[in-house]
A protein has these predicted regions:
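Conserved N-terminal phosphate-binding loop of PLP-dependent enzymes in the Aspartate aminotransferase
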Residues: 1-92
Length: 92
């Protein structure tokens, strides 16, 4: 699942995608008038609207799915996060 998140690395405002086990993080860089923190905040808001809670701190988003999460739940996390990032960057 982490390899799917890694595909976000090529996007212009995604500075880094990193993770170990079930702890993953995305770091955002600013572009134009928006700084990385604003991008991360918008991504977190889109995730929340879709039913996914993520931790946003400054320009970072951290995801910690439970170790007992099913494959379908992990798939939901990855799909929702990827969609939120792509929608946020497309709107800028």
């Amino acid at each position: 699942h982490f390899s799917r998140l890694s595909t976000l690395r090529g996007l212009p405002e995604v500075r880094d995608v990193r993770g170990a086990g079930h702890m993953w993080g995305l770091e955002f860089a600013g572009a134009g008038a928006r700084d990385g923190a604003a991008v991360a905040c918008e991504v977190a808001s889109r995730c929340f609207a879709a039913g996914l809670l993520v931790l946003q701190a400054d320009n970072l988003i951290r995801i910690n799915p439970p170790l007992v999460a099913s494959d379908s739940e992990i798939e939901f996390v990855v799909e929702t996060l990827c969609a939120a990032v792509r929608e946020t960057l497309a709107a800028s």
